[in-house]
Amino acid sequence: MVNYPHKLTSKNNIKKVKKETVDFANRGMTFEKMINDTNDYYLSRGLAVIHKKPTPVQIVKVDYPKRSRAKIVEAYFRQASTTDYSGVYRGHYIDFEAKETRQKQSMPMKNFHAHQIEHMNQVLNQGGICFVLLHFSSLKETYLLPAPYLIEFYKIDKGGKSMPLDYIQKHGYLIEQNILPSVPYLDIISKNLLGGHSNE
């Protein structure tokens, strides 16, 4: 080691540059939070009871580094999840999936799986209201697409390509984002799927 005047070493003069890491796994968390906040708003005003479904997980191994702490080190999905949210609105069962993309012209169909499409079909067959919320983060636009149009496109596309934005705009509804509720999707359901009036 080279000694410098006043016993400074060379390492004292080197600035450490911290590399920023991007967590791609949490890319959709902002949109999810917007939906959760919207659902909390609806619940607090007695408009609807809609919650995010828990993901079914089987815990296999747990470590206990301290008595008061437990750390899950191995877990598996018990079964394929269906859709993200479900609940009740004005006596109607509501069931929907939420997807986000940075693409500007289409929504990747690889985001949808056969078991989800089948589940949506089953909900519709029972008279439930089923749809997808599609958020284009680059455009700052969110659409509500009724499940029949997603199912129809999925059957043609076989889940392989992407759903064009113009298809979504033709068959879906643009949701005007708000401060609270952030994603007022119940207004779309009320006006266009139930033929009623807005909640606001």
Curated annotation (Swiss-Prot):
Transmembrane segments: none annotated. One of its GO terms (biological process) is DNA repair. Mg(2+) binds at residues 82, 84, 97, 116. Binds 1 Mg(2+) ion per subunit. The keyword DNA repair applies. One of its GO terms (molecular function) is magnesium ion binding. Keywords: Cytoplasm, DNA damage, DNA recombination, DNA repair, Endonuclease, Hydrolase, Magnesium, Metal-binding, Nuclease. The record marks 99 as: Transition state stabilizer. It is found in: Cytoplasm. InterPro entries: Resolv_RecU, Restrct_endonuc-II-like, tRNA_endonuc-like_dom_sf. Its cofactor is Mg(2+). Pfam families: RecU. Its EC number is 3.1.21.10. Belongs to the RecU family. Endonuclease that resolves Holliday junction intermediates in genetic recombination. Cleaves mobile four-strand junctions by introducing symmetrical nicks in paired strands. Promotes annealing of linear ssDNA with homologous dsDNA. Required for DNA repair, homologous recombination and chromosome segregation. HAMAP family: RecU. This is Holliday junction resolvase RecU. It comes from Streptococcus gordonii (strain Challis / ATCC 35105 / BCRC 15272 / CH1 / DL1 / V288). The lineage of its organism: Bacteria, Bacillati, Bacillota, Bacilli, Lactobacillales.
